[in-house]
Amino acid sequence: MKHQVKRYHDISCGHRVVGHESCCSRLHGHNYRVHFTCESEYSDNVKNGLDHVGRVIDFGEVKSKLCMWLENNWDHKFIAWNNDALSKKLAQVEFNHSDIDTSDNNSFVFVPFNPTAENMAQYLVDVIGPQQLNGTGITLTSVTIEETRKCSVSYGN
């Protein structure tokens, strides 16, 4: 058995699910809760995969490497599939109203997948986890994303 470290982070962002048979094909948003589960890669080298202090990783490291990635890249943004023609058109709209702040031109984040919670969780485990945790001896083993308190998806072991 291995020890696991779990931490969650809340973000708010929009998306639309291209090809969805119901209202999720429309522009909408969620207050997501993203749960990260990490394990040590060094179970053979360190006692039970724990460091000299007796932990897998400091919770602050999970926050700075994974939670803050979410905060900086997805929070309060619109996540759009790079194949979504509607989102591409919306991202090009220029607002000329004095009451709309246009100083942030990074409101749209284009990703190489249809932004379902399932695909978002897989992307975090397969792409972002290895990038952000590189050199730490820690692996992001699973992600659970709650779209609502009633509906969630998980990817990983």
For the regions a language model picked out, list residue spans one by one.
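Charge-rich, low-complexity N-terminal segments
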Residues: 1-157
